[in-house]
């Protein structure tokens, strides 16, 4: 493991020198690739440096203990040694987690589909709440997001369905844990008796696919156009700019109405279709893989209830790992980093255990 870590450190230093080269930015594609590779190694190198520092401090403390005669000082140094030994074990565990092979699709951008489930109008409003939560989280991460398609509900501000595109660094690796059924318990504004209602919305996070990832035959597609209800300016409800694509072999249907031109909507809809087909392809590959590790946090079962948002008790519970937070208002404003980090650590621990078996 330590030979590998030293090689990573040397690679990190080499990449840093390449990025500092005044001519590096002349080739933007190469520069972006180098910068991404450099960022991906930073966390490993920083953890390795902390580990190496603790090892050095341990050696110095042991030497000090060997030469120290005063009992009080020896006891103090022994306490320091015990503390450093615990720290080294913890940092070694962290390094093992960081060295686990990454899912190759973790760096992809994503398409997030949010659909209102059981609960009628309240479910549609909750779907809108989840949209805002993810938009605020994307802003905090420095990601970009856009609405690709939506279907508003009869209640103002609600969505029966909405599709977001999110782009940035390590988006799928972060957001993949959000797929599943999210449940809300609260008193609706229209509830006169003060009774708590339970509603739900489903979330599907799909890695964005490149054209080379999936083969789509033109003959397999059916294109329909219709009048847009989106931001089409004077074209809204006058020109058929919205596009619906049906992939006939799979039955998958995608639609986009957000852009002003039919061509732009078609391009976006094709991006959504590629993501859906790629997601299905990945799921099939996982099922066929021998000895597939069944993870609690990334089961791929989007019908599984993963989280409950209890408004009366200001509590959010993730049922996959038993994570509980009483900071519901902050979470609904996009502060979901602690939940995602807990899920990520649990997933990594499962993977590490599988590696050791």
Swiss-Prot record:
GO terms for molecular function: translation release factor activity, codon specific. Pfam families: PCRF (PF03462), RF-1 (PF00472). Methylated by PrmC. Methylation increases the termination efficiency of RF1. Keywords: Cytoplasm, Methylation, Protein biosynthesis. Disulfide bonds: none annotated. It is found in: Cytoplasm. The keyword Cytoplasm applies. It comes from the Bacteria. InterPro entries: PCRF, Pep_chain_release_fac_I, Pep_chain_release_fac_I_sf, Prokaryotic/Mito_RF, RF-1. The keyword Electron transport does not apply. One of its GO terms (cellular component) is cytoplasm. The modification N5-methylglutamine is found at residue 234. Belongs to the prokaryotic/mitochondrial release factor family. PANTHER family: LD18447P. NCBIfam families: prfA (TIGR00019), PRK00591.1 (NF001859). Peptide chain release factor 1 directs the termination of translation in response to the peptide chain termination codons UAG and UAA. This is Peptide chain release factor 1. The gene is prfA.
